[in-house]
Amino acid sequence: MSTSRVNDEPHKLSATAAALCPLSNCQFSGVVISQIADEQRLEFTNKYKGSCTLLCSYDSQGVVLRIVLDNDQGHVLKEYMIAADTDAAQMGKRSYAVSLESDNLVLRFASEQDQQLFRKVVENVKHLRPKSVFSQRTEESSASQYFQFYGYLSQQQNMMQDYVRTSTYQRAILGNAIDFQDKIILDVGAGSGILSFFAVQAGAAKVYAIEASNMAQYAQQLVESNNVQHKISVIPGKIEEIELPEKVDVIISEPMGYMLYNERMLETYLHARKWLKPQGKMYPTHGDLHIAPFSDESLYSEQYNKANFWYQSAFHGVDLTTLHKEGMKEYFRQPIVDTFDIRICMAKSVRHVCDFLNDKEDDLHKIDIPLQFHILQTGICHGLAFWFDVEFSGSSQNVWLSTSPTAPLTHWYQVRCLLPMPIFIKQGQTLTGRVLLEANRRQSYDVTIDLHIEGTLISSSNTLDLKNPYFRYTGAPVQAPPGTSTQSPSEQYWTQMDTQGTRNTTGMLNGGLSVNGIGDGGMDITHGLIHPH
C-alpha cells in the first residue's frame, strides 16, 4: 500500500463513547515491530527502523490498524484491517503476534498495559464473529460501499443542503420541544450529527449519536467545536451491535431512501426501538408510500431507444442483435429517479403505510401492496410512479415531510418504474394488481409489478432492481404533459401581459392598438407590411 499523509491525530471520542464502544479510536507509541523471517527457527527481523506508533480506529468491518514512525507521524507506513478472522496470540508479557494480510508480525509494546489493551482490541473484534442482524441481511461488499459513501463530507453536505429535508426536521423537533426538553435522545445513523444538534437546541438532556461510517470522527469534531460534548456522545458503530447505558425517550433518524424503503435503513430504525422506553416517541413516526399509474411517452421512448443500440446488425462490422433482448431487459429493470408533473398520473395514488412505532423488522423483508386504481383519463399506462411522505407526530404539533411531485423538490425526487409492454386503458376502467418489494442482501429491493385491467385479459408486468436506478433529473423545469392546454397558450400569455399593465408597450409595437385586439374579432397586420418597389 502506498504511503499517505496523516493530517491530524485520530480524534479522541468522548469518555462515554469510549466506554460504550470498545473499538473506539486508540493509539500505542513505542512499539517495536518485527517480522517472522523463519518460522521453524523463530527468527525475527525488524520491519521498520526505530519504534512505531499504532493508530487503531473503528471500521464497520472491524478495526483499521495504521502504522507510523514515532519520530515521523506524518506518513502512514502500512495500513491493515483487523477482522474477526485475524489470527493473533500473546507472546510473553509485552509482545503480541498477529497475522495481517501476508505479514506475520510480532509487536513488542512499551508496557504490559499497552499489550493488554491491544489484546482487548483484537479480542473485541473477534467477539463480533456472531453476525449481527445487520450483517446477516447485508453483503459485506454492499456494507463497505455503503459506509464508505456516507463517510464523505460531500455526501453529508448534499443531504444537509436539502433545505426542505433539513428545515422540516428542525421545525418538527423545535416545534415539539416538550418531547425533547430534559429527555434522553437516540440519533440513529447520525451522520454529521445535525439532528443531534437540533435535539440539543430543543433542550435535550443527553443525545447518543450512533454512526457506523467514518463520519463519526467528523461528528465528534463538530460536537467539540460547538462545546456540546456534555450533551452529545458520538458512538461509532451500528445500532445492531452497540450497547447503551440506558433507555431513551425519543429516537430520531433520517432512514428514508428512494421509494421510502431503499437502503433498508428503515429496518435499522425499527431495530433501535429495543432502546425506546414504553410510550417513547419516534421522529418520524410513520411513512406513507404513494403509488400511481402514469403516462409518459417521452420517457418510455427514451429508454426503448437506448436498448435499440443493441439492435444494430452492422456495428463496426459486428452483429449486436443477439443482445437486444437482454439490453431491453436491463434498461427496463432500472427505476427512473427524477421529477414530473403530477398531471401525468392517471388515477389517485394508492397509499401504503409503514408504522415506525409498531411495525416489525421482518415486516419489511417482503412488502406486498395490493393495488386498485379508478382511471380518471384515457391513455397509455407506461408504468407506476412512487413517492413518499413521512409524519412527525409530536405532542404539540404534527409536521409532514413530503416528496410528492406537488411539493418542493427534495434530494429523494420521485421514482418511476416502467412497463416493457405499456397498456392502453380508458377513463372509468379499473386497474388492479400488486407491487411486491422483496428485500435483498444488497441493502435494497427487487420490485415486481403486476397490473391487470379489470374485466379484460389485458395485463402487464415487470421486475426492477431498485439498487440500480437511472438518475434522469437534469435540473430543467418540469414541463406540463402534452395536450393539457384547454385554451390558446398564446392568447393566455398576452392576456396576462395586458392585465399586468403592458398595454402601452405592446401598443407601440402595434400602432397603438392592444395586442389582444385579436380577442375582438382579430387584427389584420398585413396593412403594416412594407412592400418592395
UniProtKB/Swiss-Prot annotation:
Domain SAM-dependent MTase PRMT-type: 143-452
Predominant cellular place of this UniProt entry's protein: cytoplasm
Keywords carried by this UniProt record: Chromatin regulator, Cytoplasm, Methylation, Methyltransferase, Nucleus, S-adenosyl-L-methionine, Transcription, Transcription regulation, Transferase
A Pfam family per the record: PRMT_C
Catalytic reactions on record: L-arginyl-[protein] + 2 S-adenosyl-L-methionine = N(omega),N(omega)-dimethyl-L-arginyl-[protein] + 2 S-adenosyl-L-homocysteine + 2 H(+)
Binding site for S-adenosyl-L-methionine: Q156, R165, G189, E211, E240, T268
Compartments, as annotated in UniProt: Cytoplasm; Nucleus
Residue list for modification Asymmetric dimethylarginine: R503
GO BP annotations, alphabetical order: chromatin remodeling; peptidyl-arginine methylation, to asymmetrical-dimethyl arginine; regulation of DNA-templated transcription
Post-translational modification: The dimethylated protein is the major form.
Gene Ontology, cellular component aspect: cytoplasm; nucleus
EC numbers: 2.1.1.319
Example of a GO MF term: histone H3R17 methyltransferase activity
Subunit record text: Homodimer.
PANTHER family named among the record's database cross-references: HISTONE-ARGININE METHYLTRANSFERASE CARMER-RELATED, PROTEIN ARGININE N-METHYLTRANSFERASE
Designated name of the protein: Histone-arginine methyltransferase CARMER
Gene that produces this protein: Art4
